């Protein structure tokens, strides 16, 4: 019964909202977790009340972000159940997500980015691929899943832009800049054929297995060159943070940055204003004569 409800909800979300498979899998994990906790008290998703759900969601010792995510999944479920006539009420209506302290992204400086981008050996096919990948990710602010999911058809070198497929399969066009376009074109014409060795592959960035690179490989590439450049605590998402923060610092309108990042809500983008301000405060503290 519980699995059936979850399956029906996820099918509806996929059909109506075109949510990505990763998002749907996340909803499934959270709802199955809540269903297991309810079953320990002899209750089910279908008949749980507000108190049951509060006890299942707000578990001592669990991260608040996990609680908030589980509550969000529950709210979607009960809105759908009420709409479908499975229930006549929504027991999550008054439940509030726990307050979460915003994690300010660690800022990578432009000097560190320069060292990172200079690290790959572009005289080798793998190094040229890695150089193109790093340049593109920093130039566009792509999520790692968007970068590894690119086909060459998504890249318009003449216009200097790419078409990214973001969350919910939403497309957006992002300028890639001359430097990034140069390295992507060099990789595509010089290194990619050597990596594929005659095989056909739609993916822009390919591995020695002659298939598109995975998110895990992209993560390893970033970590490897960050280590070579003497930069710690960096991930592919750090390049996205750096892209946004550096644009805001140089005065680009926040709504333009929002569009380039593919954020649905401007509030999500505003964190980069704070990061840029923190950087500015540090510069003043270091260089002002009164500090």
Swiss-Prot record:
It comes from the Bacteria. Residues 103-285 form the Tyr recombinase domain. Residues 1-82 form the Core-binding (CB) domain. GO terms for molecular function: DNA binding; tyrosine-based site-specific recombinase activity. GO terms for cellular component: cytoplasm; Holliday junction resolvase complex. GO terms for biological process: cell division; chromosome segregation; DNA recombination; DNA transposition; resolution of DNA recombination intermediates. Pfam families: Phage_int_SAM_1, Phage_integrase. InterPro entries: CB, DNA_brk_join_enz, Integrase-like_cat_sf, Integrase_catalytic, Integrase_recombinase_N, Integrase_SAM-like_N, Recomb_XerD, Tyrosine_recombinase_XerC/XerD. Keywords: Cell cycle, Cell division, Chromosome partition, Cytoplasm, DNA integration, DNA recombination, DNA-binding. It is found in: Cytoplasm. The keyword Nucleotide-binding does not apply. The active site is at 143, 167, 237, 240, 263, 272 (o-(3'-phospho-dna)-tyrosine intermediate). Site-specific tyrosine recombinase, which acts by catalyzing the cutting and rejoining of the recombining DNA molecules. The XerC-XerD complex is essential to convert dimers of the bacterial chromosome into monomers to permit their segregation at cell division. It also contributes to the segregational stability of plasmids. Belongs to the 'phage' integrase family. XerD subfamily. This is Tyrosine recombinase XerD.
């Amino acid at each position: 019964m519980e699995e059936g409800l979850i399956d029906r909800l996820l099918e509806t979300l996929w059909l109506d909202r075109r949510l990505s498979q990763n998002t749907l899998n996340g909803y499934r994990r959270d709802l199955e977790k809540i269903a297991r906790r309810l079953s320990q008290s002899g209750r089910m998703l279908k008949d749980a009340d507000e108190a049951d759900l509060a006890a299942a969601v707000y578990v001592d010792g669990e991260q608040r972000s996990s609680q908030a995510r589980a509550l969000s999944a529950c709210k979607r479920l009960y809105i759908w159940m009420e709409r479908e006539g499975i229930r006549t009420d929504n027991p999550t209506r008054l439940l509030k997500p726990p307050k979460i302290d915003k994690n300010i992204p660690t800022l990578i400086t432009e000097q560190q980015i320069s060292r990172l981008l200079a690290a790959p050996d572009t005289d080798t096919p793998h190094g040229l691929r890695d150089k193109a990948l790093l340049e593109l990710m920093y130039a566009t602010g792509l999520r790692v899943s968007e970068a590894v999911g690119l086909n060459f058809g998504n890249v318009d070198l003449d216009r200097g832009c790419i078409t990214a497929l973001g969350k919910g399969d939403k497309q957006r066009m992002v300028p890639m800049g001359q430097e990034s376009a140069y390295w992507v074109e060099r990789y595509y014409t010089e290194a990619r054929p050597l990596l594929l060795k005659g095989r056909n592959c739609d993916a822009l960035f390919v591995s020695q297995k002659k298939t598109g690179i995975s998110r895990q490989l992209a993560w390893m590439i970033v970590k490897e060159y960050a280590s070579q450049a003497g930069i710690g605590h960096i991930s592919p998402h750090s390049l996205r943070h750096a892209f946004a923060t550096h644009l805001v610092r140089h005065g680009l309108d926040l709504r333009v940055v929002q569009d380039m990042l593919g954020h649905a809500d401007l509030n999500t983008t505003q964190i980069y204003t704070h990061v840029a301000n923190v950087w500015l405060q540090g510069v003043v503290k270091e260089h002002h004569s009164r500090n």
